[in-house]
Structure formats: structure tokens, C-alpha cells
């Protein structure tokens, strides 16, 4: 059996600071009376721990609704190579994690989607 660890509430701000040392931290943030969205956070007080569902699921970080794949320059096709930033996505629900695992299988097996894999 795996050990279980608990983070006391008073230690969470220091934990968040440590996560920020790894990259930009995204977490559920209240955007209206009943709506939440994953946004970059700087302080623990910005995080909506009560969020049940966000407007867009965390898959938006791996498979955005729109993106540039190729561009043209003087009749030549150029593949667009955006360098992804390192992100920490906090507050992802288990069902979303399971969905991301399925997306990994789809986009990494067979002919891999290089844009997805890079993220």
C-alpha cells in the first residue's frame, strides 16, 4: 500500500511557492458567481478549492481549441514550432486525469502528434 501524505493548510502557501519555482501555476479560479476557470495564480487565496467543474477542462493545456500548425513564407510551407512553457496544473480532478491518459494514448501511439507530445 502506498503511503498517504497530508499537507497542513498553514503550509500550503509555502507549497505553492515551491510549485511556482518549477513553472507557472494554473489552478481553478472563480470567474463569476457559478463559473470557474483554470488561470495562472500567484497566491493561494486566488485558488477556488470548492470548484467542482471548470468552464474548459484541463485538456486545453495539452490540446488547445485552436493553434497554428503551419505557416507559409514566399510559397514555402513552414511547420510552426512553438516552445512550450513548463506548467504546473493544480486542482485537476481524477476523471480529467483519466481523460488525459486516454488522450495520451490517442496522440502518442501510432503516428504521434508532435505538437501534443511537445506540450
Predicted regions and their residues:
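Iron-sulfur-associated redox domains of electron-transfer enzymes in respiratory
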Residues: 1-119
Amino acid at each position: 500500500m502506498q503511503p498517504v501524505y497530508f499537507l497542513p493548510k498553514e503550509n500550503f502557501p509555502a507549497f505553492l511557492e515551491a510549485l511556482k519555482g518549477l513553472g507557472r501555476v494554473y489552478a481553478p479560479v472563480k470567474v463569476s458567481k457559478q463559473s470557474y476557470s483554470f488561470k495562472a495564480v500567484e497566491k493561494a487565496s486566488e485558488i477556488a478549492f470548492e470548484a467542482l467543474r471548470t468552464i474548459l477542462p484541463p485538456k486545453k493545456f495539452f490540446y488547445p481549441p485552436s493553434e497554428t500548425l503551419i505557416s507559409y513564407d514566399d510559397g514555402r510551407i513552414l511547420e510552426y514550432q512553438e516552445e512550450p512553457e513548463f506548467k504546473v496544473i493544480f486542482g485537476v480532478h481524477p476523471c480529467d486525469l483519466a481523460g488525459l491518459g486516454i488522450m495520451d494514448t490517442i496522440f502518442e501511439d501510432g503516428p504521434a502528434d508532435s505538437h501534443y507530445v511537445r506540450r
